[in-house]
Regions:
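Helix-to-loop junction immediately C-terminal to a conserved catalytic motif
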Residues: 57
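The feature captures the beta-strand-to-loop junction immediately N-terminal to the Walker
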Residues: 42-44
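Conserved ABC ATPase signature
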Residues: 152-156, 160
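Conserved ABC transporter NBD signature motif
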Residues: 65-78
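ABC ATPase NBD coupling module
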Residues: 75-96, 122
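Conserved ABC ATPase "signature" region
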Residues: 130-147
Length: 211
């Protein structure tokens, strides 16, 4: 059973610093993120937004500071104390990470359905029929044509690829999703549609998100 307390932060960051050259990146960042809350990180290109997301999600360990996450089993835990295996488990189950370029977050040569089902298989899903059904449900949630379930993402438009990547990340019902400028590479009209879809999904699923 989850120990999540709605009055306790899901994520607590204190004094976080991470740079890529000793100068540029993020410096002394502190914030709390509560269940169901959305935090938008705003800044110019190269200002350190992606670096911050990588440090908070422990894809790149910070140079200083701490990141604590409210795990289901132990409550707030400092990510620095977790093993690589435990961090990988969190990334597969409780977290999602939507990358700016959808091609970096998808397997481009396997089917759309397999991309979604693969994440379910990583947490124990094995029944082919059930996996396919859930994948189809998420295709429809993301306003993707169910008839494209067996098509490879390489044949999709950029906007479709991004929606597929989001489905792949949300299918395991994570509590926290990191989104690294998910609309930056899309046309303005596609951006608006995707942002509206994201707003509805975050509200419907009660996700916490950093965008």
């Amino acid at each position: 059973m989850s120990r999540t307390d709605p009055h306790q932060p899901l994520l607590s960051v204190r004094g976080l610093t991470r740079t890529w050259d000793g100068v540029h990146g993020c410096h002394d960042v502190s914030f709390d993120l509560f269940p169901g809350e959305v935090l938008c990180v705003v800044g110019e290109s190269g200002s350190g937004k992606s670096t911050l997301l990588q440090a908070v999600s422990w894809q790149a360990a910070p140079e200083s500071g701490s990141v604590r996450y409210d795990t289901r089993e132990q409550g707030l835990v400092d990510l620095a104390t977790l093993s690589d295996a435990r961090l990988r488990l969190l990334a597969r189950t409780d977290w999602g990470f939507v990358r700016q370029n959808a091609r970096d977050g998808l397997r481009m040569r396997v089917s759309a359905g397999a991309n979604i089902a693969e994440r379910l298989m990583a947490v124990g899903g094995r029944h082919y029929g059930e996996l396919r059904e859930v994948a189809g449900t998420w295709m429809e949630k993301m306003e993707l044509d169910l008839g494209r379930l067996d098509d490879a993402p390489a044949s999709f438009s950029g906007g479709m690829q991004q929606r597929l990547q989001i489905a792949r990340n949300l299918v395991t019902h994570p509590r926290l999703v990191f989104m690294d400028e998910p609309t930056a590479s899309l046309d303005v009209s596609v951006q608006a549609r995707l942002l509206d879809l994201l707003r509805r999904l975050v509200a419907d699923l009660g996700l916490a998100a950093i965008i």
